[in-house]
Swiss-Prot record:
GO biological process: one example: translation
Protein name: Large ribosomal subunit protein bL12
Pfam families cross-referenced by the UniProt entry: Ribosomal_L12, Ribosomal_L12_N
Gene: rplL
Species, as recorded: Dechloromonas aromatica (strain RCB)
Nucleotide-binding as UniProt keyword: no
GO molecular function: mRNA binding; structural constituent of ribosome
InterPro entries: Ribosomal_bL12, Ribosomal_bL12_C, Ribosomal_bL12_C/ClpS-like, Ribosomal_bL12_oligo, Ribosomal_bL12_oligo_N_sf
C-alpha cells in the first residue's frame, strides 16, 4: 500500500518542533540539500522608489526580560543554534537574532520573542 500525501501531511503535522528539526536535518543529509532560504533578486531599475522601500530586515534582541529561558528557547527554534550559542546571544544583547529576513518573517519572529518576554527591534 502506497503512502498518500495526506498521510504524510498528517504525520508531519503531529510532530513536535524538535522532531521536525530532526526531520529537516535528516532530509538535508540524505538528499544533500539545504533548508536555508534562497534570496531572490528583485527587478532591476526600479529607481528611487525601490531604494526607499526596505525588503530585508534584521531582528535585534535588545533585552531578554524576566523570562530568559523562554527567550533562549525561541532563539534556538528560530536560528537552529545550540543551547550555549543561543544563551550567549541572549546574554550578549543587544545582538542580531536574524539578518536579511522578509518583513513578514521579521514581524513573526518579533512577536514570538516578545511573547516570550524579550525586548525586540526590527531594523
Amino acid at each position: 500500500m502506497a503512502i498518500s500525501k495526506e498521510d504524510i501531511l498528517e504525520a508531519v503535522g503531529s510532530l513536535t518542533v524538535m522532531e521536525l528539526n530532526d526531520l529537516v536535518k535528516a532530509f538535508e543529509e540524505k538528499f544533500g540539500v539545504s533548508a536555508a532560504a534562497v534570496a531572490v533578486a528583485g527587478p532591476a531599475g526600479a529607481g528611487a522608489a525601490a531604494a526607499e522601500e526596505q525588503t530585508e530586515f534584521t531582528v535585534m534582541l535588545t533585552g531578554a526580560g524576566d523570562k530568559k529561558v523562554e527567550v533562549i528557547k525561541v532563539v534556538r527554534a528560530a536560528t537552529g543554534l545550540g543551547l550555549k550559542e543561543a544563551k550567549d546571544l541572549v546574554d550578549g544583547a543587544p545582538k542580531a537574532v536574524k539578518e536579511g529576513v522578509s518583513k513578514a518573517d521579521a514581524e513573526a519572529l518579533k512577536a514570538q520573542l516578545e511573547a516570550a518576554g524579550a525586548k525586540v527591534e526590527v531594523k
